[in-house]
């Protein structure tokens, strides 16, 4: 008994039945009972190595036979080639032509409609019942003679020559009139009530008096005059926004007796900056700062 168990050592453990024994018993059961009960002839067993088959090493060094294609596909059961063809051939694929779709669709598949599609009559050869032949030409514009060439060759931004001439006559006096006719260059003391009003009495200008109800002023001009602005401040520098006439003639304003007695120092009086006798306002500021 010890000799039998000594042979059955599986990974250091004595076992009664090893995996090899179980596989051998299973293989014997498969060979004894037929695999396919319907097969009439006894073929070679599936796991028995045949002399012509290639033997591969299997699980736990057990030899297994490489099954060939002839062994897997048993020749006992033959599939006849006419099994499916006879079944399909008994009933042909046919359909009822009249009941599938209406008969008026056939008019679209006539050979006449597949002619030259660029021709003028290709749209009206076979319209069918859905689109009568008279409805298609009405959708297209009628181009004939000079009207067609005028519509095709003329750009959308083109304008007649007389319109462009009128526009230049209208736009040019608006830009040139404030420079030539504005009396602001003569000085602020010209005496005119509204020196910035655009005068439209130029020769060659076609602007009516009613087309410009408002007064046009240049961007750099201001509505008030220069003397009223400079009298409010004691600075002799010209304002930032002034008329060209004000820039040409700059008047130096003198310091009045009231401003001199009040201690207001004007920027135009350059002699006041040179005098520093220690009795000015700067000394009093320094003494106040010490506290």
Swiss-Prot record:
Cite the source lineage: Eukaryota, Metazoa, Chordata, Craniata, Vertebrata
The UniProt function text for this chain reads:
Transcriptional coactivator that may regulate cell type-specific differentiation pathways.
The protein's organism comes out as: Danio rerio
| Name of this chain's protein | POU class 2 homeobox associating-factor 2
- Tell me the GO molecular function terms: POU domain binding; sequence-specific DNA binding; transcription coactivator activity
Ranges of Low complexity composition bias in the record: 200-211
Domain remarks in the entry? Answer: In the N-terminus possesses a conserved OCA domain for bivalent binding to class II POU domain-containing transcription factors and to an octamer DNA motif (5'-ATGAAAT-3').
Signal peptide span: none
Q: Which family does it belong to?
A: Belongs to the POU2AF family.
